[in-house]
Curated annotation (Swiss-Prot):
Protein name, entry field: Vacuolar protein sorting/targeting protein 10
UniProt key word Transcription regulation: no
Subcellular locations according to the entry: Golgi apparatus, trans-Golgi network membrane; Prevacuolar compartment membrane
Glycosylation: residue positions: 314, 339, 985, 1280
Keywords: Glycoprotein, Golgi apparatus, Membrane, Protein transport, Receptor, Repeat, Signal, Transmembrane, Transmembrane helix, Transport
BNR repeats: 68-78, 120-130, 395-404, 456-466, 498-508, 740-750, 1119-1129, 1160-1171
Stretches in topological domain Lumenal: 30-1369, 1444-1502
UniProt membrane topology term: Multi-pass membrane protein
Disulfide bridge map: none
Broad class of the protein's primary localization: Golgi
Amino acid sequence: MIRQCLHLTTSPLLLLLLIALSSIGTVVAKSDGPKIASIQLETEPSMPFYFENSDTVLFLRLDTGEVYQSFDGGVEWKVLGKDHETEGETAGLANGAVMIQAHPYDNQKAYILGRHGVHWVTTDQGKTWREFEVPAAPSMFNEPLRFHGEDSGKVIFQGERCSAFACVETSYYTRNNFETVKPMRDTARGCMWAVATPGFADSTTEHAEEIRDRVLCIVHGLKNPFASAYRLVYSDSFFEDDQDGIEAKLNEGRPVAGIINAAARTKYIVAAAKSQGTDELAMFVTDDAITWHRAEFGNHKIEESAYTVLEGTNYSIEVDVMNTDRSTNMGVLFTSNSNGTYFTRNIEHTNRDMSGLVDFEKIAGVQGIVLVNVVDNWEEIENDPKADRKVISKISFDDGRTFQSLKVKDKDLHLHSVTAFENIGRVFSSPAPGIVMGVGNTGTHLKSYTKDGDLYVSDDAGVTWRLALEKPHKYEIGNKGAIIMAIKDNDKPTKKIQYSINHGKDWETAELDREIIPYFLTTTPDSTSLKFMLVGYVEDPADWYIYAIDFEGLHERECKDSDFENWPARLDENGEPDCLMGHKQFYRRRKSDANCFITETMFKTPKPEFKSCKCTAEDFECDYNFVRSEDRKECVPATILKAPEGTCKNDDDTFKGPSGWRLIPGNVCTRDGAVELDKEIDRPCKDALKTPSGDSKAVSSTANYIETEMFGEFFYLERAGSSRGEDETIIMRTTDGKLYVTHDHGKSWTHELKDVKIQQIAPHRYLNDRAFFLTSGKKQYYTINRAESFDAFSAPAEVNPSGLTLGYHEEFKDWMIWTGPGECSHGECPKVSFISKHRGDDWEILLRAVEKCEFMAREDRKDSGSLIFCDQHEGEKVDGQRMLVTSNDFFATSTTPLTNIIDFATMAEFIIIATRNPEKENSLKVDASVNGVEFADAEFPYNLEVPVQLAYTVLDSSTHSVFLHVTANNKMDQSYGSIIKSNSNGTSYVLSLNDVNRNNGGYVDFEKLPGLEGVALANVVSNTKNVEKGSEKKLTSMITHNDGSQWTLIPPPAKDSEGKPYSCGSDGKPTDKCSLHLHGYTERRDPRDSFGSASAIGLLFGVGNVGESLGSKSEASTFFSSDGGISWKEVKKGNYMWKFGDQGSVLVLVEELKPTRDIYFSTDEGDTWEKYQFSEKEVTVQSLSTVPSGTSKNFLIWGKETGSSKLVTINLDFSGLRDRTCNLDEDTGESEDYYLWEPKHPLQEGNCLFGHVEQYHRKKPSSHCWNDWSEAHVHRISHNCTCTEEDYECDYNYERQTDGSCALVPGLLKPNAIDYCRENPEAIEYWEPTGYRRIPLTTCQGGKNLDRWVSRPCPSHEEEYQRKHGPSGAVIFFAIIVPITIAVAAGYWVYTRWDGKFGQIRLGDGGAQSFVTSRGDSPFITIPVAIIAGTVAAVKVLPLLVMSLWRSVTGYVRIPGRRGPRPYATRDAFAARRGDYTHVVDDEDELLGDDEFEDEEGDERN
């Protein structure tokens, strides 16, 4: 309901007199107050929107979706589509609007966005409206409209298309203001124009034509749907010529993954990236949409949601970076140089709030003046965040170089700013030149707004201030400063408004028709109008009022030239006009005491005048690759300078080089006779870049002796891609509890926490910079900065003696779960899980009598932020039946979806639970879930001949399917079983491979190759019948290239490393008598090692032999493949360890556990090998490690000097081999240094693998350069292929025949396909079974359709079936839609997300051990294991043994040798082994029963 009224503040007698005087022609037409009109609403309105330079205003009624429009500043209102006489297509507008958006660069245009794909546009400030349609709702996550900075007809519409299960962000574009609309592409975080602002258009004239239609979009990764793989791509043809677009070269000419946001600011585009494994952001900036640079903030770290890009200038970017804990909310203000690359610190301890708002504002229209609030007692706040903060105000008149206090005469003034703003629009200033206002107080610091606040005003841009009105007021400036209006704002009703016509020196009063509590006061954005709008409310009854207040009648006189002054915008310390960016700035401004209004040019924004100055030092900035010195007086090189060719023959020579300075682009200072800091200077050659020699002499080695009995566990705290820094940090615990740290990859070590005995290291699963150091007591230690410093907290219980102690949250970095023994008087104390949301500062109990609790948060698992799973004993009794208990509110409420469980494990998107089978005694069964809410029984194939399921091992799920090993024989030293593979939700399994080898510990000879889709190696027992009779196992190695659908023998090389043919001679083709066999996971001394590395795609090593079966490891040779396992060659006789460096640029081999002083390395993909002597004395090498990503040029040998007890680490540094970074043309993918490598299937043509051709960059073996890239990068998915037989596998209850076809298992009936309809009531149709199902990983299109031949309508959906043809998209046990990219990328998620959760649970009465890996960079990790005392920490994907009883987990991780438990090693060793498995084991067997391990365990117990 709307009620309108109009009233004047003049008396009736005076009004009659004025009318009479007017009727006789007198010029006296002056009123004593403003005209006031109002309307009443029943609900709160949205913020009003003004058309700039007009009195036309709109607002949206939030409850009804009605749009109100006024052409007279709010006096008269009409509802568009109902009672509006405006021309145009507005009929559908009556109740259909969700938002109003102005065009930011064209004051004639605005847009009303509707709910149902129908929207409206005006091009004449609301006089007419035109309807247009876009088949998508406005995006809820991205700005719905993105505008072009030069052509106002170009607009990007960002919407979302939703089905019953998911929404897809998509972008459309128009080039004619929605006369026509075209789809552009699906996105992850939306699209924007390269020319996104007028300032960008003005500054890029050189490339104007090239980027005129350029669009930038943040899209999903090619193989990974998660935010860590988001890419920034661009297109100059709206993605019509190239659907995927071209990746922007953000960092040194190369693309960057993990783009989370991109935005335009003045003449810059800023993009932020965050890599997996860090909370640090990298910011990239461009000023031409072509060349990008990483922004440098010195030693300051930028974190997600911990920085704010502020209002900048046309020559710099302002960024406030939070440099404290979020509870204290203080920051550092930085200003960039002119290209946005190097940022300098302006002022520290800026005041921020929890939402990231910063107390910062540039004074509108005046260059160089900035108002900020800082925390004066910052030290007290850092020590006690709950202490009262003392905020003070500061102002700068020189672009932030210096700051000073605000002054009211001789008193300091402090003003409430952005974080406490009580109005809309700017806080202090407006386009009215020099008029600045604020609410605050004088004194030592800022006090309460309501109790102590007064209104202050300055009319000289903040140089001097005076009290305007007592008590806090909302305020607005109109008519370019000629009128100021205010209303008291102390949370009490008022009807009095006040106004001033002389810059706030004197005030007049007018009254409203009722008392209201003011909500906001506003006027036109350019502050040119004489009309104001006030919105307020009354509490009883709850009504809202909108007041239009018109001051046009206060004066009749139009201002003349004599009423204006030429006002200097900035003054120096002498009171003279000051220079900035090479000029002085002036405004033609109405004098404060002029008795007039500016009516003739009312709606024209004031424009400044400029006068040039001579160049001074302040007009220069640091040039590219230079940064300010500490005293900010010089520009010093940020990198080593390269001397020109032909110079620097001796170190004593000099060469002409850059001074380090350049004139700030856009600076207009006069250079004649002025300072010239940018002239070239002489630079010493000794500081220039030296050229490496390029041979083995350039490799260096550094040895360090560690005084300890034995190495323990160690972890690389590797920097992620967006993390700035060059250190290569390792933390290492010795078996006697000492902690050692190196920041230079083992070249030097320091002993930390010297008075503390560390029992375990528990690296943070999701953040590489963090690690926790657990002791036997309750005081625990941790680092959050890569072991630069250490802090402590008090744990709520001691370390868990038999399982995981610490659990981490994927999103909230300070959330932790601690599980440990509770307090009891006798017997075995039940374990208790606690939660802390503040990194251990405080703890609350989650559940008692648990085995473990884990966070289940996952980026693609809806509403899982607070989801927790616990394995709890019924009745909170130690001997109570175990049950799965879940909660989304920290167990204020909970559910119990499964009882009688053995354990649960998480693998990528899958949650696998082993429970006792109620229908079969002493047998287990598997349940699965994807969303953590709905669970379903797993259906095993009937041809799986395992009558009693006593043991499972959950293997890899990196290809959107679970691989599960079901044990057929679990007798000591005879164990083997079948590998079955699930569908996309983990519930329906088909047989993949029989008789796969399993060891006594429940681990399996099965490994997916890092980075290669669908390629896996396995060892099978070829003599199972003899094994059943007690014979030793004979193992045969097999390989699959299509994700386990088909397995083949591994082809042997034709000749050995000496050029001799193998005795079994097969001409390179595998036969039963002659194939390559490789020692697998169950035989590794370091369980975290892998055949390959995710960063060196397709490069593989293995130790084994050629023959009929796998021979002794002592007689093995070392083999290498460069094509993903399709072909192999022997590279060395003997058993060697291997590692990959610089993404495969350097391959290193060292003989395992034999005295040696030499390593071998190759820089040409294994074609040739060079020997390097790393020690004068022979060393027995126990492990070889490098950073988990395999991108370092440093390696570390762990060993013991032969003939002595000295333990030694030896760093190998290969960085001197090459002197340049390889050149890459990302647009074509090839260059003089790179070629494109395509994985392929050995039996398929055209390099199609899983329905597409994938291309990777590979450095040419002949190129003498470094990759210097932090992650393996897919160049592109060049195209999808048509479907062939290789894109299908046998369906449930079908098996592969000798001719390759799939047939029903004999004796079984076809599955009842209509069950699908019963399980999915919303499904429209089902398909008759064909015996085939698509491999979840494939993206093929068209071609052979083997899985869907005949469809049928589901009962009661016949009519819908007729209307819709195609699959329903539901899955077996609950509805879920998973994009193809998820299917392709699940392994990458495993690699990046699940670093450190890899546990094992065993049966029987023996001790148990947990296996752990450190973090690595391997997308398709399988089977990592290593032993760690008392807890499972830092692994990528848990192998988990689920069995009938829970057993304790004990032991230590250390370098193999001398009867000690297993170590932690490198990327491939270390964390590389990321995603492996979990097992469920039998009742009687000792797991990890291998003699070596049992002895090691015994040693540790003793």
